[in-house]
Amino acid sequence: MMKIIQTQLKDMPSSLLAELGSYRYSVFARGEGWSIPSRLSTPGQEYDRFDRSDVSWLIAWHARKGICGCARLMQWQEPGNIEGISVPFDRKEAVWEMSRFSARLDVDAELPLNILWHAVQMAELAGIDYLVSAATPMLEQMFEQHKVGFEPLTPGLIQSEDNLFAVKIPVKQPELAEKYRGARRFSPEEVLPSLGVSMNWQSNGR
């Protein structure tokens, strides 16, 4: 069973933090070819300067397959005076950035929607109006297929992923609510027993 863990970096057990770093490395550094600053380099793991202690994470966890997806949520920082980039928000609107958003479609073809639902739920509870997220054409196609409200934005609005196209996602998502209403999030402590079993199973199976 897939469980969505909600935690902050400061509260994340070291075993889960290491597993997350390895997952991020496999997706973003090895898979997407992103470079890792040398001062943040840990062999086989991916971190960046935005991994602050108060940053929130959603982690999709499967008892046998380990981490299958994630999303990082933090306050969106308006970019500096960059030519060609206009800020698409009213000054009164509260915005979070959702970065490092990924999911293993081979495990669950709709996992991005599940993670996104929990992200907009967290944001709405915190009084946030919109999420800004990096997006791929495939992800935008999935959003359109499942009637997820979003608006394409220009690249450069997400400082932690400034080479990617971005989308503006309102926290009010009726179609996702219909699909996932009642789904809960878990603390790391609730999942840790299965974390230990999974890691032992993985090491024995290699």
What name fits each language-model region?
Residues 163-206:
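Charge-rich, low-complexity intrinsically disordered segments
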Residues 1-46, 57-61:
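Short amphipathic alpha-helix that is part of the acyltransferase structural core
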Residues 74-88:
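Extended low-complexity intrinsically disordered regions
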